[in-house]
């Protein structure tokens, strides 16, 4: 029964997970309440700047995650790439005998790279931050998810687009960075 009310990442670190240049492996399960915010370019939960996220959320949990600028709410930080084996982010959200996870994830805002002065898009709510890393997202059982995209990114997915889910119980609601509902017709509760 963990309760983490305000995990805040330092500069380029995730709220919970990896620091600058580091991937984060995080498991949140069974009667836990977590609120996490990434530092500049770090995921709320997952990888820091240039780091991937390997995140499992399971059972009766309440998770609120917000990415730092350009980073995912849950997933990777800015500038992350697939590992040597070609694997990107791995995110699993599922129900179990203790109950249903409720997840609110918001991608970080867009910004400007201070070194290159190039525009950086926002991060996905769940998935990949600004960068080339792919996201392997698995949702199982009954889930309640609200995901909001950062500017020029997706609510749930990676640079290849919104990930489609079928055959789930519960609800998935997706919003773009302007607050427009972009929930897919295949999402439960649509």
Segments and roles (model prediction):
Residues 1-9, 16-38, 47-67, 76-149, ...:
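Surface-exposed loop/turn motifs in large extracellular/passenger domains
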């Amino acid at each position: 029964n963990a309760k983490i009310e305000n995990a805040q990442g330092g500069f380029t670190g995730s709220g919970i997970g990896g620091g600058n240049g580091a991937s984060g492996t995080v498991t949140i399960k069974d009667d836990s309440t977590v609120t996490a915010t990434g530092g500049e370019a770090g995921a709320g939960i997952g990888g820091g700047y240039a780091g991937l996220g390997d995140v499992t959320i399971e059972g009766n949990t309440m998770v609120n995650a917000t990415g730092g600028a350009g980073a995912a709410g849950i997933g990777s930080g800015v500038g992350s790439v697939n590992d040597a084996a070609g694997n990107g982010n791995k995110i699993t959200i599922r129900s179990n005998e203790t109950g249903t996870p409720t997840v609110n994830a918001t991608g970080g805002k867009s910004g400007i790279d201070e070194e290159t002065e190039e525009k950086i898009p926002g991060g996905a709510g769940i998935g990949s931050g600004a960068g080339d890393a792919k996201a392997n997202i698995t949702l199982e059982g009954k889930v309640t998810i609200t995901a909001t995209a950062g500017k020029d990114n997706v609510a749930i997915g990676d640079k290849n687009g919104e990930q489609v889910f079928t055959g789930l119980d519960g609800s998935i609601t997706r919003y773009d960075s302007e607050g427009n509902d972009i929930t897919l017709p295949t999402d439960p509760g649509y």
